[in-house]
Amino acid sequence: MAAVKDSCGKGEMATGNGRRLHLGIPEAVFVEDVDSFMKQPGNETADTVLKKLDEQYQKYKFMELNLAQKKRRLKGQIPEIKQTLEILKYMQKKKESTNSMETRFLLADNLYCKASVPPTDKVCLWLGANVMLEYDIDEAQALLEKNLSTATKNLDSLEEDLDFLRDQFTTTEVNMARVYNWDVKRRNKDDSTKNKA
């Protein structure tokens, strides 16, 4: 089955049947028939299969940790972008007046300094990695609105991916329990057969 890039968003793919793949997260396949599953090549013993399933489970846990970190980072960025947009809107109103704008800016943790800012049509934005660029207020506002939209879409996508990942946890845990129970039944059957003999 071929996968093609979809317009759903960054990192998302759609398969031929319209199902969505999530950021390269492999889908855990539910084991319906444990007997036939255990007869497949590579599934010689229950311990081997349980080890593989546990490795898969640990990979899902690692992916969850990474996605949760991205989610926290985005949840921190979105309010900052909104606050900066509010400041730009305020500056947009004030740029026509001749009065200076009084403000406080952060020097260090819990240390602010007062400043008087004359009306201006230019602002400087931190872009990250110690890079700051000067923009017209309108350009800065457009850039920040685009960044806010992208961050919101990415957050929604991360939420969906985390939900998908939780489903994979559940499926993997159920598979592990089914294989373990199958092995217990098999050993009990073997023990009862030996006791009869």
Curated annotation (Swiss-Prot):
The modification N6-acetyllysine is found at residue 59. GO terms for cellular component: cytoplasm; cytosol; intracellular membrane-bounded organelle; nucleus; prefoldin complex. The modification N-acetylalanine is found at residue 2. It holds the Pfam family Prefoldin. Keywords: Acetylation, Chaperone, Cytoplasm, Nucleus. It is found in: Cytoplasm; Nucleus. One of its GO terms (molecular function) is unfolded protein binding. The keyword Nucleus applies. InterPro entries: PFD3, Prefoldin, Prefoldin_subunit_alpha. SUPFAM superfamilies: Prefoldin (SSF46579). Ubiquitous. Disulfide bonds: none annotated. The keyword Acetylation applies. One of its GO terms (biological process) is microtubule-based process. Belongs to the prefoldin subunit alpha family. Heterohexamer of two PFD-alpha type and four PFD-beta type subunits. Binds to the C-terminal part of VHL. Binds specifically to cytosolic chaperonin (c-CPN) and transfers target proteins to it. Binds to nascent polypeptide chain and promotes folding in an environment in which there are many competing pathways for nonnative proteins. This is Prefoldin subunit 3. It comes from Homo sapiens (Human).
